[in-house]
């Protein structure tokens, strides 16, 4: 690929000829892959348009996007293989669940649910002498593999970011802090409707990882603890506009026929513009684990904090339970944007309390977390069947990747007996690893 070829392509792309000449004259001898170069050019074009031609940094963008000292073949590029399963999972919310007024939550109508419940009940009865049934944290409680989702929890976390590239890219270009926070609120809601599970995902093994590309968002997850189950993550977009990072832990309590889950941790979204946000998730309640109607409910409250401007988006998921909103659907929520001086937060994110005397109200909103969010008469988010970004496997992944788990591979091939044995092998390996760690931990 020579200089004239690149120059012609970039002129066709829309760059003024004098700009192309100035910025490419020093790269005449370079040969790089066209696809990558034009991606860099796209970033440079945005800066050129933004500053009316006064600042065009394609040379700088080249240095930012290419690892210096490495050849073209050494650059990590994503595979073109698309992950197709996301489309069937996105259909769950409106094919497997019924939304009815006066119900505690969404009602699962999956025809296979009774069989799954039967297997789970039988397994729990066989373990009745254990302490699991008495309210102990059961996130690592093992069922037969046929009772599980065909994804690990790490893959579920990635799936919940299905709308992130579109929403966060929009936030980057907004100028008004309040409009940014409104759009960040839609980011949280978009994760909630994707968090609805038909059945329990597979527990990640300690040290298990997952790498995936969601549109232009590169995501890396690792299971760093199992008690409580904790996942660290780092995600960034290819334009370096923003990054998502931190950790999330899950605490669950099993009742006789229900499950309560709290998702908490340090979840940050940071933009190159300096804006930084922190998210606090609501709680989850699942009824009908073993008998009766299976229901899924989001409870308590959630927060999106603008740490840069001291603004808060407060979302109340108990709104449908008040007398005023008795006729609302079970997924109804209300919220408000406020300017704040101080905030009191439950360490595990179950209940978020705001000191009212230190707040200034800015806006109110409401919606249904399965389908819509509105500020006044304006709709800021609406669920669509084609909302999700495409997901791709990465070419270079660690051997600890979820997609390489033997039990998961066999399970997806419907080799249930072999998959069940492989799952038990994974659990035994992890159990032995824990014993070994504890032994040497005590030694020091």
Range-by-range predicted roles:
Residues 3, 8-10, 71-74, 78-82:
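N-terminal cationic leader/targeting segments used for protein routing and processing
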Residues 31-35, 74-77, 230:
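Short, solvent-exposed polar/charged micro-motifs at secondary-structure junctions
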Residues 77-444:
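Extended acidic, Ser/Thr- and Pro-enriched interaction/regulatory segments
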Residues 1, 27-29, 40-43, 69-72, ...:
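Conserved beta-strand elements of beta-rich interaction domains across eukaryotes
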Residues 1, 14-15, 27, 69, ...:
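Short, flexible coil/linker elements and helix-boundary hinge sites characteristic
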Residues 22, 64-66, 219:
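Generic structural motif
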Residues 1-61:
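Canonical RRM/RBD RNA-binding surface and closely related RRM-like beta-sheet modules
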Residues 55-76:
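Low-complexity RS/RG/RGG-rich segments used by eukaryotic RNA-binding proteins and nuclear co-regulators
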């Amino acid at each position: 690929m020579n200089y004239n070829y690149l120059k012609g392509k970039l002129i066709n792309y829309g760059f003024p000829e004098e700009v192309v000449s100035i910025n490419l004259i020093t790269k005449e001898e370079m040969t790089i892959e066209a696809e990558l170069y034009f991606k860099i050019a796209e970033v440079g074009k945005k800066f050129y348009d933004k500053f009316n031609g006064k600042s065009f940094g394609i040379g700088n963008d080249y240095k930012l996007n290419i690892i210096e000292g490495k050849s073209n073949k050494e650059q990590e590029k994503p595979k073109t293989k698309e992950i197709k399963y996301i489309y069937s999972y996105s259909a769950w919310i409106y094919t497997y669940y019924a939304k009815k007024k006066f119900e505690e939550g969404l009602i699962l109508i999956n025809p296979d649910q009774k069989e799954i419940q039967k297997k789970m009940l039988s397994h729990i009865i066989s373990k009745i002498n254990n302490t699991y049934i008495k309210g102990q944290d059961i996130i690592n409680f093992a069922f037969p593999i046929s009772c599980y989702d065909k994804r690990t929890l790490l893959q579920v976390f990635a799936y919940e970011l299905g709308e992130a590239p579109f929403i966060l890219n929009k936030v980057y270009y907004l100028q008004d802090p309040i409009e940014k926070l409104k759009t960040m609120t839609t980011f949280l809601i978009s994760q909630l409707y994707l968090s609805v599970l038909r059945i329990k995902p597979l527990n990640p093994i300690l040290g298990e990882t997952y790498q995936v590309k969601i549109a232009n968002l590169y995501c890396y997850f690792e299971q760093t603890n199992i008690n409580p189950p904790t996942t660290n993550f780092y995600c960034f977009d290819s334009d370096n506009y923003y990054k998502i990072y931190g950790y999330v832990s899950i605490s669950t309590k099993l009742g006789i026929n229900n499950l309560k889950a709290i998702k908490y941790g340090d979840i940050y979204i940071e933009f190159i513009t300096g804006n930084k946000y922190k998210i606090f998730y609501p709680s989850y309640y699942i009824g009908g684990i073993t008998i009766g109607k299976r229901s899924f409910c989001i409870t308590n409250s959630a927060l999106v904090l603008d740490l840069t401007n001291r603004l808060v988006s407060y979302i109340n998921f108990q709104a449908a339970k008040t007398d005023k909103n008795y006729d609302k659907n079970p997924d109804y929520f209300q919220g408000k944007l406020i300017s704040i001086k101080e905030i009191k937060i439950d360490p595990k994110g179950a209940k978020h309390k705001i000191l009212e005397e230190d707040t200034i109200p800015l806006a109110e909103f409401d919606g249904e977390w399965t389908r819509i969010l509105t500020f006044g008469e304006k709709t800021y988010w609406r669920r669509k069947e084609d909302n999700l970004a495409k997901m791709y496997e990465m070419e270079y992944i660690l051997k600890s990747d979820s997609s390489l788990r033997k039990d998961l591979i066999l399970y997806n091939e419907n080799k249930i007996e072999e998959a069940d044995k492989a799952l038990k092998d994974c659990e035994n390996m992890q159990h032995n690893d824990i014993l070994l760690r504890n032994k040497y931990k005590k030694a020091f």
